[in-house]
C-alpha cells in the first residue's frame, strides 16, 4: 500500500509540514538568526533566544522567490530528520515517500527547476506535485474545518453566518459544483496574504488564470517594518527589535471594522498598554490587562501606549498612500484582476472569494474586505468572502493535505522515473511552470 504523501507548505516565514493523514501540521520558522554575540540559531531554535535585541535574520526567500537552497536544505533537514522535536516524525530516507509542496506564484523557471533537482536528486522522493497554495484551495469539498462566509451586503450577513452548510461559498454556482462529479470548485478567487506579499489569484476549473493574477507588495514583513518605524518615531528606538515588534503586531493590531476615520475618532477607547520585556520576568513583553490596572508593575517597567498604531498599520492594505506607497490597494487590485477575466465569470468569482495566509488572522480583515469590495461592484452582484475559523496560516497546509487524497493529485504528480526520463526542463515547462498558460 502506498504511503501517505508528505505535505510541505514552504512559506517564506514559516514551514508547515507533515504526513497528509495528520490533522494539524508541524511548524518550523523558515529562517536563520544570529544574535549580537555571533551565535546562530536555526529555525525553531530562534524561539530559545533570551536576548532578542539586535537579532539579524537570513531567509531562503528573497522577494518571494526561493533563491537560497543552501540554507533551505538545512532547514528541511531540521524538519524532516528531527524526530525528537517533531513528535517522532522522521523521513529517514526519501525513497518510498511522495511529496506535495507549495511554491510561490510566478516562480522563475530556473528557480523552479532547481527545486525539482533538489527534491528528486538529493531527497530522492518517489513523486512530486508542487503548485501555488491557491491551486489547492478549490479542492476543499471534503475540508473538515470550519469556514466562515461573509457577505458584502448588510442584509445577508446574519443569514450567511448562520448557515452551517456554507462551508466554502454561497453562490448557486458553488452549490452546483459541490453536486457535480469533480473534486474541486469550478470558480474561486483566492487571496493569499502572507509574509512577503499578497497574491490575488483567480482559479478556473482548478487552474490559475495567470493573465489576471495580481500581486500587492504588502505582507507581514512590510507591516512589521512599518510598525518598527512608527514605534521608533513615537516611543523608543525599535529598529533592531524585529522579534519584539513582530510579537506586538501579532498580539495587538487589528483592521478598522468600518473605516479608518471611524476608528480614529474612537482611538482612545481602543488604546492598549504594552509592557516591554525586562529579560527577567518576560522576554517578549505582554499586553497589560485593563482589568488589572491596580496591580503594581515593577519599578523599572517600561510601557508604551498604542493608540492609532493599532489600526493605522493594517490600513495600508486598503490605503497604501498612508505609508507613502503610490500603488493601488487590495480592493483596487482585486477589481483590476476581475477586469482581466472573461466577463461571464466575474460575478461567479466575486461570489466565491476565499482568503488564506497569516495576515487574515488580523481581526476584521475579511469583514472589511467584503464591505469595501461590495461598494465597488455592480448592485446586482453579491460579494461573498470565506475565511477559516481557525488559524488562517494553517489553511494552506490543510487544503494541500485534502488535495493529496484526490484522484486529481494521483493523475497530475510527476514520478522520479518521469523526471529522469524527461529532465527538469520538461517538468518546469509542461507540468509545474506557468508559461504555457499565459
From Swiss-Prot:
GO annotation terms (biological process): chromatin remodeling; regulation of DNA-templated transcription
Alphabetized Pfam families for the sequence: Actin (PF00022)
Principal localisation: cytoplasm
Composition-biased stretches (Low complexity): 163-174
Location of region: Disordered: 158-181
SMART domains xref list: ACTIN
Any one Gene Ontology cellular component term annotated for this protein: Swr1 complex
Subcellular localization(s) per the UniProt record: Cytoplasm; Nucleus
InterPro entries the record matches: Actin, ATPase_NBD
One annotated GO molecular function: nucleosome binding
Alphabetic keyword roster: Activator, Chromatin regulator, Cytoplasm, Nucleus, Transcription, Transcription regulation
Subunit structure as annotated in this protein's UniProt entry: Component of the SWR1 chromatin remodeling complex composed of at least ACT1, ARP4, RVB1, RVB2, ARP6, YAF9, VPS71, VPS72, SWC3, SWC4, SWC5, SWC7 and SWR1, and perhaps BDF1.
Function: Component of the SWR1 complex which mediates the ATP-dependent exchange of histone H2A for the H2A variant HZT1 leading to transcriptional regulation of selected genes by chromatin remodeling. Involved in chromosome stability.
Note: Present with 238 molecules/cell in log phase SD medium.
Record family assignment: Belongs to the actin family. ARP6 subfamily.
Protein name (Swiss-Prot/TrEMBL): Actin-like protein ARP6
Organism in which the protein naturally occurs: Saccharomyces cerevisiae (strain ATCC 204508 / S288c)
Lineage: Eukaryota, Fungi, Dikarya, Ascomycota, Saccharomycotina
Gene (name only): ARP6
Amino acid at each position: 500500500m502506498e504511503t501517505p504523501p508528505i505535505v510541505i507548505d514552504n512559506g517564506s516565514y514559516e514551514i508547515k509540514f507533515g504526513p497528509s493523514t495528520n490533522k494539524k501540521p508541524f511548524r518550523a520558522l523558515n529562517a536563520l538568526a544570529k544574535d549580537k554575540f555571533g551565535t546562530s540559531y536555526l529555525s525553531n531554535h530562534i524561539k530559545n533566544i533570551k536576548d532578542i535585541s539586535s537579532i539579524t535574520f537570513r531567509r531562503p526567500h528573497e522577494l518571494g522567490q526561493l533563491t537560497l537552497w543552501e540554507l533551505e536544505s538545512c532547514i528541511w533537514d531540521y524538519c524532516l530528520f528531527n524526530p525528537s522535536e517533531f513528535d517522532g516524525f522522521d523521513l529517514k530516507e526519501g525513497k518510498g515517500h511522495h511529496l506535495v509542496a507549495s511554491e510561490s506564484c510566478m516562480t522563475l523557471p530556473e528557480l523552479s527547476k532547481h527545486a525539482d533537482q533538489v527534491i528528486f536528486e538529493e531527497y530522492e522522493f518517489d513523486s512530486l506535485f508542487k503548485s501555488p497554495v491557491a491551486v489547492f484551495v478549490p479542492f476543499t469539498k471534503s475540508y473538515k474545518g470550519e469556514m466562515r462566509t461573509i457577505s458584502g451586503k448588510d442584509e445577508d450577513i446574519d443569514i450567511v453566518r448562520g448557515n452551517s452548510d456554507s462551508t466554502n461559498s454561497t453562490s448557486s454556482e458553488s452549490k452546483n459544483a459541490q453536486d457535480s462529479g469533480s473534486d474541486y470548485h469550478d470558480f474561486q478567487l483566492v487571496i493569499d496574504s502572507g509574509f512577503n506579499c499578497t497574491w490575488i489569484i483567480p482559479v478556473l476549473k482548478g487552474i490559475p488564470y495567470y493573465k489576471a493574477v495580481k500581486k500587492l507588495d504588502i505582507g507581514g514583513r512590510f507591516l512589521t517594518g512599518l510598525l518598527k518605524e512608527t514605534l521608533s518615531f513615537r516611543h523608543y528606538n525599535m529598529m533592531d527589535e524585529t522579534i519584539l515588534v513582530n510579537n506586538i503586531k501579532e498580539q495587538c493590531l487589528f483592521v478598522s471594522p468600518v473605516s479608518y476615520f471611524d476608528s480614529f475618532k474612537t482611538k482612545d477607547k481602543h488604546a492598549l498598554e504594552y509592557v516591554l520585556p525586562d529579560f527577567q520576568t518576560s522576554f517578549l513583553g505582554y499586553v497589560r490587562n485593563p482589568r488589572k490596572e491596580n496591580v503594581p508593575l515593577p519599578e523599572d517597567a517600561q510601557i508604551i501606549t498604542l493608540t492609532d498604531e493599532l489600526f493605522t498599520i493594517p490600513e495600508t492594505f486598503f490605503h497604501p498612500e498612508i505609508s507613502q506607497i503610490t500603488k493601488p490597494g487590495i480592493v483596487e487590485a482585486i477589481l483590476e484582476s476581475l477586469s482581466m477575466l472573461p466577463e461571464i465569470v466575474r460575478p461567479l468569482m466575486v461570489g466565491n472569494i476565499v482568503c488564506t495566509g497569516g495576515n487574515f488572522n488580523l481581526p476584521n480583515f475579511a469583514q472589511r474586505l467584503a464591505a469595501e469590495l461590495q461598494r465597488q461592484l455592480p448592485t446586482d452582484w453579491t460579494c461573498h468572502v470565506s475565511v477559516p475559523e481557525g488559524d488562517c496560516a494553517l489553511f494552506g497546509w490543510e487544503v494541500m493535505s485534502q488535495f493529496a487524497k484526490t484522484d486529481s493529485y494521483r493523475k497530475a504528480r510527476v514520478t522520479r522515473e518521469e523526471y529522469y526520463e524527461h529532465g527538469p526542463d520538461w517538468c518546469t515547462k509542461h507540468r509545474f511552470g506557468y508559461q504555457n498558460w499565459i
